[in-house]
Amino acid sequence: MKSPYQGKPEEKWLAITKRLINKHPLKDEIVDVVLQSWEDIFNSRIGSYSIGKEIFPEPQMMGFFLHELVAQNLALKYPKVYKRGDAKKEKDIHNTEDPSLGIEIKTSSNKDKIFANRSYAQPSSDSEKKDKNGYYLAINFEKFSKKGRKPRIRLIRFGFLEHEDWIPQKSEKGQQAHLSDLAYKTKLITLYQAE
């Protein structure tokens, strides 16, 4: 897929991102689906125990639940168009009619940053793997605290990212990648921010 930013000056990237988001069919629903999915976690039970009352999962587990529920809730609402991506070529939220509208989901308990596997900073090298370029849903949430307050969704952003936007850890043993400051400024749009 050709980059929508290729050959365009950086000062135009934000406008390009806004255009890409405006043409996405889920742009008006993403916030509601994410917030409902977050509530679904706290309405869940594991055995006889409730999440947030007797069980307090670590951030990685909360991110996993959120990641899964957002995709499942969209698949439930639009069963002929969306499904949870389950093949190596499919995005986390797979659009069966137009795969270019699929969405990768990244969650983090960091205040405002998201992270990915180091491989996201490399171009897709073979046709057996999913394209790392495309729409991304970035969700930041609070961890459980000792104060007992229910954690909240901090930030929901939607945008269009490419492998060049990810910066791998410098250490060769490092397995993580983070986004460039330019990507945060021009390629992710804030849809929701907790007060």
Language model features by range: what are they?
Residues 1-91, 107-195:
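Nucleic-acid endonuclease domains
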Residues 72, 94-102:
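Active-site beta-strand-loop-beta-strand hairpin of nuclease catalytic cores
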